[in-house]
């Protein structure tokens, strides 16, 4: 469980531990503040669960291999990868250069890819390999003032859905969780967090997606306050191009969802050829 020192990650770690998982509680160390995973592990232990800490920053060189090794060295196996670590980053303005965008992508996308690569050999040996990518509806709809963050989460969604298709034969379940929660990352200055959106309200969905009982894969789930909804990309019916056609299709008549870009193209081709 990456990014599990507080907020959503801590709630997810505790929920999985309550279901019987032994959890690696990962979070980067900060020299100027306490190492919060220690407290998360203590709460898990007090509740009768099993957990250990890991202080690797997910974007550091070799971190993926070290994080995975923490689980293997301690328990000899790895069944679940929950990729929660991420940053919102500053607002990226046109003309500001690439540095801020690259930083957000390095943590929100590239680090997750590296962890998947490091974990896959072990997940393939597991009787119930599961990967849960923690994303955001910003990756589906965009976020005004946070274009880099939205781009990173949109890329993460596409990566996860593609990976789900690639790993279907390995029986590894891959899903995306887009939680709504009031955390330090989402809080506005001087604003009290909404108790309805406590991180625990999305934790049950995370624990289910990570469980052996979950037989779903290749899907995006939005969760918060103990509720859940499905999300997916949709395309409308097909019409010959004209400005009027764009106006008509913007209302999304006959919306269609697809399992992969290949299926979307095949359906489009059938519409234009009648075959």
Model regions and ranges:
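Canonical Rossmann dinucleotide-binding motif of NAD(H)/NADP(H)-dependent dehydrogenases/reductases
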Residues: 1-24
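Conserved glycine-rich Rossmann-like NAD(P)H-binding loop of the short-chain dehydrogenase/reductase
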Residues: 21-37
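C-terminal helical subdomain
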Residues: 176, 194-275
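Residue(s) in the substrate-gating loop at a strand-loop-helix junction
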Residues: 136
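Catalytic Tyr-X3-Lys loop
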Residues: 79, 87, 97-113, 132, ...
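Active-site helix of classical SDR
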Residues: 116, 152
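Conserved mid-core segment of classical short-chain dehydrogenase/reductases
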Residues: 35, 57, 86-102, 145-148
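Active-site Tyr-X3-Lys motif and surrounding loop/helix of classical short-chain dehydrogenase/reductase
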Residues: 66-73, 92-95, 99-106
